[in-house]
Amino acid sequence: MSDINEQHRTSIFPYSAKKRRVLISGDSFAEGQTDTRHRFDYQINKLSNKYHATSIGCGGYGPSQQILFAKRFITYLRKDDVFILLTCGNDFGDISRKTIFGRSKPHLTNSGNRIEIKPPDDSFLYYFRDKSFLLGYSLQFLDAYNMKWNFSDQEVRDSHNIYCSFVESYFNNLKSKNIIPVIFLHSLKNTRFCNELELKLHSKNINFVNLSDLLSNKVYLSEDNFHWNERGNLKIAKQIVNYIDNKLEN
């Protein structure tokens, strides 16, 4: 079972000295938007006694923040352990957004082929956001109302370039430590230029698996028709176990 402390996230990978550790980071899917016993990290640990998986996430903040959040746990990974970045199709819109849920957040920019992390806005408005219910609710409502969902072709391509460059840099760092990094893509069926994205990942020698077709069937979705239900979590758990098994055999 995953033993991460849900409140403080301080306990990770206990009792796994003889097992290969699998750290999974991502958005709300990785947070486990389902009954605890149906989370796919729990399912992985039930499917195989060779692995100890723990899934973490920070929904809505984009892949860059998912990686940054995971950094504090990377130190628990050893040689030949596995790091998985679970990337949803809507994560690419989160890359360059400056706010989420009425909160200012770090965001990535691409200027002159140089990727930069811009810090969050530290204005008094956002400082008092968490100290006033009315202000917090108002900012969250306005953020949801004004949230951008339609992006130009250039914006989509820019987000893909930022994603690939940021991930490439971090994955190369993990490889230098003999940690196995891989991306699991999903919910990309309606994402423009997804074929171009896959070609970019291939060109940068980034290992990835696209689960979009596999998980598109609604029988794998929960009542919100977005997150995975018990069957969906079990499906991806089996895919992860099979991938790691095959990767280690080769």
Task: Locate predicted features.
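A conserved hydrophobic secondary-structure block that centers on an alpha-helix together
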Residues: 53-63
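Second-shell loop/turn segments in exported
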Residues: 28-31, 55-56, 156-157, 222-226
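Interaction-surface signature
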Residues: 63-155
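Membrane/wall-proximal cationic-aromatic binding patches
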Residues: 1-47, 215-219
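Conserved, well-ordered alpha-helix/loop/beta-strand core segments that scaffold catalytic motifs
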Residues: 81-93, 141-215
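Histidine-centered active-site loop/cap adjacent to the catalytic His
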Residues: 224-250
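Conserved beta-strand elements of the Class I
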Residues: 23-25, 54, 82-83
